[in-house]
Design a protein with these regions (language model features):
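Short hydrophobic/aromatic beta-strand or adjacent loop that forms the aromatic wall/cage
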Residues: 9-13, 75-79, 114-116
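Short, well-ordered beta-strand micro-motif
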Residues: 16, 79-83, 99-101
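A generic structural micro-feature
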Residues: 4-8, 72-74, 91-94
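Active-site segment of metal-dependent pyrophosphate-handling enzymes
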Residues: 58-88
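Conserved N-terminal beta-strand and adjoining loop/helix that marks the start
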Residues: 1-22
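NUDIX/MutT-family hydrolases
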Residues: 90-128
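Conserved Nudix-box catalytic region and its N-terminal flanking loop in Nudix hydrolases
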Residues: 17-55
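Functional cleft and adjacent loop/helix regions within the main domain
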Residues: 31-35, 41, 81-82, 93, ...
C-alpha cells in the first residue's frame, strides 16, 4: 500500500449512488464503510477505486469522478463518485452490503468516523 509523504496510507474510497441509496459495505467486525481500500505502490488512486469496488462488491466501474480528498488520522482518502454496472455481491473484505437511503437513517449504523464524515461532505455537495 502506498503512503502519503505525511506517512498516511493512501486510500481510494467510492460513492455509488443507486435508486436504492448509497452502497455501503459491512466488514467482518460489523463496521460499515464505503467501498474502497488501499492504493497499491505505483497504482493511480482512480485505478485503485475501480479495483477495490470490484473486489468488494463485484460491480464494474463505468465512470469515476474525483470528488475530494478526506484526511483522517491514519489515511488520506481519494473520494470518487462512481457509476457502476452489475449486481452488487459482497466479497473480499465485505461480509454484506447495504444501501443508505436517507441521511437521517445513518445514525443507527456503525459507520466508521471517516465514512460518516465523507458521507456528510458528499451530501452537503462536497467537491474538490
Amino acid at each position: 500500500m502506498t503512503r502519503h509523504p505525511s506517512s498516511k496510507r493512501l486510500r481510494a474510497t467510492v460513492i455509488v449512488r443507486r435508486e436504492e441509496g448509497i452502497l455501503l459495505a459491512v466488514d467482518h467486525s460489523g463496521l460499515v464503510l464505503l467501498p474502497g481500500g488501499g492504493v497499491d505502490h505505483g497504482e493511480l488512486p482512480l485505478v485503485a477505486a475501480a479495483r477495490e469496488l470490484n473486489e468488494e462488491t463485484g460491480l464494474i466501474a463505468t465512470a469515476l469522478q474525483f470528488l475530494f480528498h478526506h484526511e483522517s488520522p491514519t489515511n488520506l482518502h481519494h473520494v470518487y463518485y462512481c457509476v457502476a454496472e452489475g449486481i452488487p455481491t459482497a466479497a473480499d473484505d465485505a461480509e454484506r452490503l447495504l444501501y443508505l437511503d436517507q441521511p437521517a437513517n445513518a445514525s443507527p449504523l456503525n459507520l466508521s468516523a471517516a465514512t460518516r464524515t465523507i458521507l456528510a461532505r458528499y451530501q452537503a455537495g462536497g467537491r474538490c
